[in-house]
């Protein structure tokens, strides 16, 4: 009888101990849950204030993969065009293609905590999935502004500073390399030939190597391009007859020929107007790969600095022969 009473007493004490432990664990779990709650902040975007995660962990974008990756952000989905960029391919291995324009359904599947877009199509639907920041085309004017802006959006200001320190170091080294192979008064132009036979001249912030040439390397544009194109922040289509007015000592041309079937560049190069350009006569025309020179995200611009520097040095050596 005494043994039974003793056993019952021990059982009661055991149950009380388990209950107490359970209560403590429950409180701890509740505390952990509270600490894991996402910290939010207000971001002042060009389109108004947006409440976004202070440190987003899953970002989807249509156009800004390179900008976000440059500051170490975790991009889980990106627009289709990003995957054509040779400088981003290795960084996009685990990133999902969400289409172009981006598919609301594909974005939803990725469960992002932040969406960053240039294109406002379907933006109201995207806002229902996650906080959505709209950054219009040409909001930032150079690499430094771009990196600073996306470092802020991604809660990665330290990474942004680190990227810019490396970028500026590279740009200064590149300037020293080319100083001995180009004349200090030489002019540089950025152009594009299309499969439709259009010929465009570009500014310092429209891709095609403009940021690398004018901003990073500090090279000069002809006065005509400076006044009519760069200062106006525009691209300008040129008729063949006026190309000489916008010609530079060095001409970088992207050839937009997506199907590889267009002969418009051949036609241009065989024209008397083209053959009489000083850049052509002195072998200072560079035909550049469209996919490599179209983008102007910080990672791509950094790579373009390397390519352009190497091209100028190599061509100078060739022209000595």
Swiss-Prot record:
Q: Which GO terms describe its biological process?
A: iron coordination entity transport
Bilayer disposition of the protein: Lipid-anchor; Peripheral membrane protein
Q: Where in the cell is it found?
A: Cell membrane; Membrane raft
Q: What cellular component GO annotations does this protein have?
A: membrane raft; outer membrane-bounded periplasmic space; plasma membrane
- Write out the entry's keywords from A to Z: Cell membrane, Ion transport, Iron, Iron transport, Lipoprotein, Membrane, Palmitate, Signal, Transport
- A Pfam family matched in the record: Peripla_BP_2
Q: Where is the major localization of this protein?
A: membrane
**Lipid attachment in record (N-palmitoyl cysteine):** 21
For whether the record's keyword set contains Aminoacyl-tRNA synthetase, the answer is no
Region: Disordered, residue numbers: 24-48
Q: Fetch the SUPFAM superfamilies from UniProt.
A: Helical backbone' metal receptor
Q: Where is the Fe/B12 periplasmic-binding domain?
A: 58-316
Q: Give the positions of lipid attachment, kind S-diacylglycerol cysteine.
A: 21
User: What does the sequence similarity comment in the record state about its family?
Assistant: Belongs to the bacterial solute-binding protein 8 family.
Could you describe the subunit structure of this protein?
Answer: The complex is composed of an ATP-binding protein (FhuC), two transmembrane proteins (FhuB and FhuG) and a solute-binding protein (FhuD or YxeB).
The protein's job, in short, is: Part of the ABC transporter complex FhuCBGD involved in iron(3+)-hydroxamate import. Binds the iron(3+)-hydroxamate complex and transfers it to the membrane-bound permease. Partially required for the transport of desferrioxamine.
Name recorded for this polypeptide? Iron(3+)-hydroxamate-binding protein YxeB
* Native species: Bacillus subtilis (strain 168)
């Amino acid at each position: 009888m005494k043994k039974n009473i003793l056993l019952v007493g021990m059982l009661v004490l055991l149950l009380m101990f388990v209950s107490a432990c359970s209560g403590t664990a429950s409180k701890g779990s509740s505390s952990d849950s509270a600490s894991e709650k996402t910290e939010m902040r207000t971001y002042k975007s060009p389109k108004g204030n947006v409440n976004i995660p202070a440190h987003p962990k899953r970002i989807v974008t249509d156009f800004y993969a390179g900008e976000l990756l440059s500051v170490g952000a975790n991009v889980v989905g990106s627009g289709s065009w990003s995957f054509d960029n040779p400088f981003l391919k290795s960084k996009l291995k685990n990133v999902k293609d969400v289409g172009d324009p981006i598919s609301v359904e594909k974005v939803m599947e990725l469960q992002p905590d932040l969406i960053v877009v240039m294109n406002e199509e379907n933006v109201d639907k995207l806002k229902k999935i996650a906080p959505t920041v709209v950054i219009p085309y040409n909001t930032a004017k150079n690499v430094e502004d771009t990196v600073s802006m996306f470092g802020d959006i991604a809660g990665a200001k330290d990474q942004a500073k680190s990227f810019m320190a490396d970028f500026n170091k590279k740009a200064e080294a590149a300037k020293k390399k080319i100083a001995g192979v180009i004349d200090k008064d030489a002019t540089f132009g950025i152009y594009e030939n299309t499969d439709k036979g259009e010929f465009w001249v570009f500014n310092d912030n429209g891709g095609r190597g403009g940021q690398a040439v004018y901003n990073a390397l500090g090279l000069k544009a002809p006065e005509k391009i400076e006044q009519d194109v760069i200062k106006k922040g525009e691209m300008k289509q040129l008729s063949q007859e006026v190309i000489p007015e916008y010609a530079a000592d060095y001409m970088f041309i992207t050839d937009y020929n997506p199907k590889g079937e267009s002969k418009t560049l051949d036609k241009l190069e065989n024209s008397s107007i083209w053959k009489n350009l000083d850049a052509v006569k002195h072998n200072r025309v560079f035909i550049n790969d469209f996919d490599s020179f179209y983008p102007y995200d910080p990672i791509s611009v950094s790579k373009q600095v390397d390519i352009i520097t190497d091209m100028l040095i190599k061509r100078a050596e060739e022209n000595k022969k």
